[in-house]
Amino acid sequence: MKFLFAFNFFSLYIYLYEFLCIHLCGSQVTPAGTVLNSNSALISRRINRRKMKNCNNNDLLKVLKMETTYNELPAHNLLMSSKNDINKLFDYINKNEELSKLMNSCGTYVYLKYLGVVIFSIKENVQISHLSEFIQYLLNKNVCIEFNQNVML
């Protein structure tokens, strides 16, 4: 019953939002459907990653073996998820001085709370040896990592 009420309330909220914004603000409003579709794609990708035992790809192996450069990477953003709480892992990395320096030399991250994923943006002047070491640490902590061209910080 609570779920049905919450769903109906959410639907009512969306209809009111569409009416007020589109009719009063004009047509310069981005429709909510595209945002929901991109979030659902991230959610389904996260679920797929958690089900897979080996969720890492050949591009990561090239980074680990230091056989690539920044310009040869398929994307400059990494989508990360884990069966464990990935937010706690990144909190630990931030508190550890050595790991924090390593992570900051590689790039920056944003934790998406409701999706339970991290989007990591690789710095343009990253040393592949540092990136390799950071990725190896994450893989040892059972983090699924994917190069993703569709997400940006």
From Swiss-Prot:
This protein's name: Subtilisin propeptide-like protein
Keywords: Cell membrane, Membrane, Secreted, Signal
GO MF annotation list: serine-type endopeptidase inhibitor activity
Annotated segments matching region Dispensable for parasite growth in host erythrocytes: 127-153
Location(s) in or outside the cell: Secreted; Parasitophorous vacuole lumen; Cell membrane
Major localisation: secreted
Membrane topology: Peripheral membrane protein
Gene Ontology BP terms: negative regulation of endopeptidase activity
Signal peptide annotation: 1-27
Species annotation: Plasmodium falciparum (isolate 3D7)
Cellular component terms (Gene Ontology): extracellular region; plasma membrane
Keyword Signal listed: yes
Its biological purpose: Acts as a specific inhibitor of subtilisin-like protease SUB1.
Keyword Phosphoprotein: no
